[in-house]
Amino acid sequence: MLVLLAFIIAFHITSAALLFIATVDNAWWVGDEFFADVWRICTNNTNCTVINDSFQEYSTLQAVQATMILSTILCCIAFFIFVLQLFRLKQGERFVLTSIIQLMSCLCVMIAASIYTDRREDIHDKNAKFYPVTREGSYGYSYILAWVAFACTFISGMMYLILRKRK
């Protein structure tokens, strides 16, 4: 049981770390001479422009920002609730509250990555002065980490739903 508990805790912390890196790091769309994410655009590795309200489709990027932040926060809250439930639940009960919050985190990261996937081309086309060389880019590792975090939070949420507290 102790090994299972250690695995679940490590898996949850890994999920939270993936969410944090995907949210903060600047590599959602990358190319040879640039990298961009939902916070800023950098060309030549030195010239960075912060995305603000003068940006076309800013509300779309704000939706991605908000859902990624919310996903990270919910994942952390789920971890703390799991730790509390370890000491509070009676033997044989399930970690339903932890599961629900973790699955909400999963839903938020899925929404963020889906919005970015769907709207990326429009964002780049409408902001050509900010994205002069982005046609030759591809999805970066932060974007991929967001989708990996989606899978991890989903699996984690389902584990909590199935898991029962034992002695």
From Swiss-Prot:
<dbReference type="GO" id="GO:0043534">
    <property type="term" value="P:blood vessel endothelial cell migration"/>
</dbReference>
<dbReference type="GO" id="GO:0060914">
    <property type="term" value="P:heart formation"/>
</dbReference>
<dbReference type="GO" id="GO:2001212">
    <property type="term" value="P:regulation of vasculogenesis"/>
</dbReference>
<dbReference type="GO" id="GO:0001913">
    <property type="term" value="P:T cell mediated cytotoxicity"/>
</dbReference>
<dbReference type="GO" id="GO:0007566">
    <property type="term" value="P:embryo implantation"/>
</dbReference>
<keyword id="KW-1003">Cell membrane</keyword>
<dbReference type="GO" id="GO:0010594">
    <property type="term" value="P:regulation of endothelial cell migration"/>
</dbReference>
<dbReference type="GO" id="GO:0000139">
    <property type="term" value="C:Golgi membrane"/>
</dbReference>
<dbReference type="GO" id="GO:0003093">
    <property type="term" value="P:regulation of glomerular filtration"/>
</dbReference>
<feature type="glycosylation site" description="N-linked (GlcNAc...) asparagine">
    <location>
        <position position="44"/>
    </location>
</feature>
<dbReference type="GO" id="GO:0045766">
    <property type="term" value="P:positive regulation of angiogenesis"/>
</dbReference>
<dbReference type="GO" id="GO:0045022">
    <property type="term" value="P:early endosome to late endosome transport"/>
</dbReference>
<dbReference type="GO" id="GO:2001046">
    <property type="term" value="P:positive regulation of integrin-mediated signaling pathway"/>
</dbReference>
<dbReference type="GO" id="GO:0034394">
    <property type="term" value="P:protein localization to cell surface"/>
</dbReference>
<dbReference type="GO" id="GO:0005886">
    <property type="term" value="C:plasma membrane"/>
</dbReference>
<dbReference type="GO" id="GO:0005634">
    <property type="term" value="C:nucleus"/>
</dbReference>
<dbReference type="GO" id="GO:0044854">
    <property type="term" value="P:plasma membrane raft assembly"/>
</dbReference>
<dbReference type="GO" id="GO:0007015">
    <property type="term" value="P:actin filament organization"/>
</dbReference>
<dbReference type="GO" id="GO:0032060">
    <property type="term" value="P:bleb assembly"/>
</dbReference>
<comment type="subunit">
    <text>Interacts with PTK2; regulates PTK2 activation and localization. Interacts with ITGB3; regulates the levels of the heterodimer ITGA5-ITGB3 integrin surface expression. Interacts with P2RX7 (via C-terminus). Interacts with ITGB1; the interaction may be direct or indirect and ITGB1 has a heterodimer form.</text>
</comment>
<keyword id="KW-0225">Disease variant</keyword>
<dbReference type="GO" id="GO:1990266">
    <property type="term" value="P:neutrophil migration"/>
</dbReference>
<dbReference type="GO" id="GO:0001954">
    <property type="term" value="P:positive regulation of cell-matrix adhesion"/>
</dbReference>
<dbReference type="GO" id="GO:0007155">
    <property type="term" value="P:cell adhesion"/>
</dbReference>
<dbReference type="GO" id="GO:0045177">
    <property type="term" value="C:apical part of cell"/>
</dbReference>
<dbReference type="GO" id="GO:0016324">
    <property type="term" value="C:apical plasma membrane"/>
</dbReference>
<dbReference type="GO" id="GO:0007160">
    <property type="term" value="P:cell-matrix adhesion"/>
</dbReference>
<dbReference type="InterPro" id="IPR004032">
    <property type="entry name" value="PMP22_EMP_MP20"/>
</dbReference>
<dbReference type="InterPro" id="IPR004031">
    <property type="entry name" value="PMP22/EMP/MP20/Claudin"/>
</dbReference>
<dbReference type="GO" id="GO:0001952">
    <property type="term" value="P:regulation of cell-matrix adhesion"/>
</dbReference>
<feature type="glycosylation site" description="N-linked (GlcNAc...) asparagine">
    <location>
        <position position="47"/>
    </location>
</feature>
<comment type="function">
    <text>Functions as a key regulator of cell membrane composition by regulating protein surface expression. Also, plays a role in regulation of processes including cell migration, cell proliferation, cell contraction and cell adhesion. Regulates transepithelial migration of neutrophils into the alveolar lumen, potentially via mediation of cell surface expression of adhesion markers and lipid raft formation. Negatively regulates caveolae formation by reducing CAV1 expression and CAV1 amount by increasing lysosomal degradation.</text>
</comment>
<dbReference type="GO" id="GO:0005178">
    <property type="term" value="F:integrin binding"/>
</dbReference>
<dbReference type="GO" id="GO:0009986">
    <property type="term" value="C:cell surface"/>
</dbReference>
<feature type="transmembrane region" description="Helical">
    <location>
        <begin position="1"/>
        <end position="21"/>
    </location>
</feature>
<feature type="glycosylation site" description="N-linked (GlcNAc...) asparagine">
    <location>
        <position position="52"/>
    </location>
</feature>
<dbReference type="GO" id="GO:0045121">
    <property type="term" value="C:membrane raft"/>
</dbReference>
<dbReference type="GO" id="GO:0006915">
    <property type="term" value="P:apoptotic process"/>
</dbReference>
<dbReference type="GO" id="GO:0031410">
    <property type="term" value="C:cytoplasmic vesicle"/>
</dbReference>
<dbReference type="GO" id="GO:0016020">
    <property type="term" value="C:membrane"/>
</dbReference>
<dbReference type="GO" id="GO:0045765">
    <property type="term" value="P:regulation of angiogenesis"/>
</dbReference>
<comment type="similarity">
    <text>Belongs to the PMP-22/EMP/MP20 family.</text>
</comment>
